[in-house]
């Protein structure tokens, strides 16, 4: 018959004195108190490892910081793990690792790592817009939460205040960006499943609205308005550059001199600055080349064609033309992105081939099969088309287009 160990008492533990050599006091079921020759008293739990069956011991801490009842609770917890073939010490190490990972893998920190990858494939302005939206609306709610603890309802709750203020388009973009962060977390091994896949379905869909724009026959009044507006020469040139090249606001504002091929009369925009992440070449009309000649002395030999007045080593803000349109009284009637719509309408009404127009707008065919077979950029066909557009703008600017039914600029779309 095996000898039964008598459980320890606090009185016995307190009375235990150090000896020349270390010795043990036994509480039973593997729990012992090691009395060191130095006088310290250390709790230990002896057990067999589930896989190797090797005898080992687990430290529970020192007495009296860890009381007798505390040590027994820790022993009970370890025995529960052992009953499931889980090594208590390995479990403890994993918890420490998870705790450390949680501190370095909060939503904010993971989002930052994702954003550093994302910004290499989008324009600087767009990358900044992504970060500002997360910084403003998401990080205050879930930025400090470990990515492993985030559930779908956590994300929905974080976005709900944005819905409450009626910013449904912002809600749509936030859901998309959050989902990209969570997919990044999955792809880097931080989480097994993506909880954000369907969070957009928890919100009302925004009504799609066209960018405020005007018809081509209203170009003369637009040109007159901008010619007489109180704006700087650089801003006026940027407005004309964006109008003549049919580019997006950020693409136009961030144009660099080293992207211009004067011999070929071309502007080669690298993929990194394009919305669709594809190189785009713009044939430059006589009017566009004239804008460049005007900007040479104004840019002062700097990298950017349209340098910022406040920070000359940086480009003008992509919203500069938008602000100028508002100051000219066109707020709500025309936005800078709408300049592309004017050109698109004019070119389509003139009968230019749709594929050539789409190429000029740097649109990507949504039909993947068709896109795979049709890789033409229609560069040569775009040259006369862009010159036709520049001639139309010039005629509108000189007032040589006969106006009809134009009492005031009106909203289109």
Curated annotation (Swiss-Prot):
- Domain Core-binding (CB) intervals: 105-186
Annotated GO biological process? DNA recombination; provirus excision; symbiont entry into host cell; viral genome integration into host DNA
Q: Domain Tyr recombinase, which positions?
A: 209-386
Q: What induces it?
A: By AlpA.
Q: Name one GO molecular function term.
A: prophage integrase activity
Signal sequence bounds: none
UniProt xrefs under CDD domains: INT_P4_C
Arranged from A to Z, the UniProt key words for this protein are: DNA integration, DNA recombination, DNA-binding, Viral genome integration, Virus entry into host cell
An example of a Pfam family matching this protein is Arm-DNA-bind_3
Under PROSITE patterns, the record lists: CB, TYR_RECOMBINASE
Q: Where in the sequence is the active site?
A: 248, 275, 337, 340, 363, 373 (o-(3'-phospho-dna)-tyrosine intermediate)
SUPFAM superfamilies xrefs = DNA breaking-rejoining enzymes
Enumerate the InterPro entries for this protein: CB, DNA_brk_join_enz, Integrase-like_cat_sf, Integrase_catalytic, Integrase_DNA-bd_sf, Integrase_DNA_bind_dom, Integrase_recombinase_N, Phage_int_M
Phenotype caused by lack of the gene: Loss of excision of its prophage.
Q: What does this protein do?
A: Integrase is necessary for integration of the phage into the host genome by site-specific recombination. In conjunction with excisionase, integrase is also necessary for excision of the prophage from the host genome. Part of the cryptic P4-like prophage CP4-57, it excises the prophage when overexpressed, which also requires integration host factor (encoded by ihfA and ihfB).
Query: In which family does this protein belong, per the annotation?
Result: Belongs to the 'phage' integrase family.
What is the protein name for this chain?
Prophage integrase IntA
């Amino acid at each position: 018959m095996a000898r039964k160990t008598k459980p320890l008492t606090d009185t016995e533990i307190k009375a235990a004195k150090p000896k020349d050599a270390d010795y043990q006091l036994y509480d039973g079921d593997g729990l012992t108190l090691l009395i060191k020759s130095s006088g310290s008293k250390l709790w230990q739990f002896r057990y067999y490892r589930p896989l190797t069956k090797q005898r080992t011991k687990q430290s529970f801490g020192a007495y009296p910081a860890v009381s007798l009842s505390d040590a027994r609770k820790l022993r009970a917890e370890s025995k529960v793990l052992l009953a499931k073939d889980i090594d208590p010490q390995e479990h403890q190490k994993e918890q420490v690792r998870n705790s450390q990972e949680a501190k370095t893998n909060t939503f904010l920190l993971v989002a930052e790592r994702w954003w550093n990858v994302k910004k290499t494939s989008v324009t600087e302005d767009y990358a900044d817009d992504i970060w500002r939206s997360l910084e403003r609306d998401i990080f205050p709610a879930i930025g400090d939460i470990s990515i492993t603890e985030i559930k779908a309802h956590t994300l929905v709750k974080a976005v709900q205040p944005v819905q409450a203020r009626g910013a449904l388009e912002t809600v749509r973009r936030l859901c998309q960006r959050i989902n990209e962060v969570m997919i990044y977390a999955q792809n880097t091994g931080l989480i097994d499943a993506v909880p954000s896949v369907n969070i957009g379905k928890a919100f009302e869909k925004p009504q799609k609205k066209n960018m405020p724009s005007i018809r081509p026959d209203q170009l003369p009044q637009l040109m007159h308005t901008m010619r007489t507006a109180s704006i700087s020469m650089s801003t006026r040139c940027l407005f004309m550059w964006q109008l003549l090249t049919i580019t997006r606001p950020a693409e136009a504002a961030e144009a660099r001199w080293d992207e211009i091929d004067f011999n070929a009369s071309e502007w080669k925009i690298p993929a990194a600055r394009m919305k669709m992440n594809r190189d785009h070449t713009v044939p430059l009309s006589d009017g566009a080349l004239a804008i460049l000649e005007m900007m040479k002395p104004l840019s002062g030999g700097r990298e950017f064609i349209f340098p910022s007045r406040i920070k000359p080593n940086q480009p003008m803000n992509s919203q500069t033309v938008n602000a100028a349109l508002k100051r000219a009284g066109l707020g709500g009637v025309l936005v800078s992105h709408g300049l592309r719509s004017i050109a698109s309408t004019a070119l389509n009404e003139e009968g230019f081939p749709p594929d050539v127009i789409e190429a000029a707008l740097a649109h990507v065919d949504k039909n993947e099969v068709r896109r795979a077979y049709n890789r033409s950029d229609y560069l040569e066909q775009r040259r006369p088309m862009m010159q036709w557009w520049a001639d139309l703008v010039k005629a509108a600017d000189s007032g040589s287009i006969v106006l009809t039914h134009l009492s005031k600029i009106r909203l289109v779309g």
